[in-house]
Amino acid sequence: RTLSESTKDFRFACAANTSLDYKPGQFYRFVFADERGEFERSYSLCNFDELYGQHIDLVVSQVDNGRATNLLFNCKEGLEAKVTGPFGRLTLPEEIPTRLIIVATSVGLAPYMPILKELEMSGFPEVVLLLGVRDRTEFIYGNVLKGYAEKHDYFELQLCLSREKSSEGYEYDGYVNTQIERLDVNPDSDHFLLCGNPKMIDDAWGYLKESGFKSKNVVREKYVFARESRSSAKAL
């Protein structure tokens, strides 16, 4: 399904009698095969409607001449992949903070979709999503997120536009890092999850560290090629 000019989502059915066992926010490793042989990519689960069923939802942004996107964006129904996982630490904290701030750029939103579903049953008092995009055409799952904000008083959506002017109440001019600085963050009561562009994450972590945050309260996941993890693998 096409979400924007450069972004699509995909659904993979699990093998027979297999269901998902993961923490919302984690990712899986996919081994695909094309005419050049097998290759691996890592993708966060984007399941929202059903967290633990028998399918995996992915969001993929097109990369020029990218091997995975060339395969996925041109595939027909029936494409198969070998999948191992889950991996990753970008999950909800065990201790509920006064305020949870989740930050993403572009398709870095993906792992937060299952997290938002889990939050409906988790009792977090305040959750803020900072989502950075260049313009509104990149605001994927916009209707879902706006509907979620209307339904849940604990949730606030802040869309940061770097190449368009804000006009709606939930929109802000500039980058997510600028918006972080506007939040009056508190290292004693706030907990951060950061996902997306590596530079955004490095800059945000630098600011938060200077503001008194420890690494245990700022969980970071950079969207880069072939992410590594030492978690044990399990075939699906």
Segments the model singles out, each with a brief description of its role:
Residues 1-77:
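Ferredoxin-reductase
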Residues 36-44, 88-95, 230-231:
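Short, Lys/Arg- and Gly-enriched loop/turn segments at beta-strand edges
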Residues 42-53, 93-106, 211:
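Short, compositionally biased
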Residues 79-90, 178-179:
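Helix-loop module immediately N-terminal to the HCX5R catalytic loop
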Residues 80, 99, 125-128, 154-156, ...:
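Residues at the starts of beta-strands that form the adenosine-phosphate
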Residues 111-120:
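Histidine-anchored nucleotide/phosphate-binding helix
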Residues 135-236:
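Reductase modules of NAD(P)H-dependent flavoproteins
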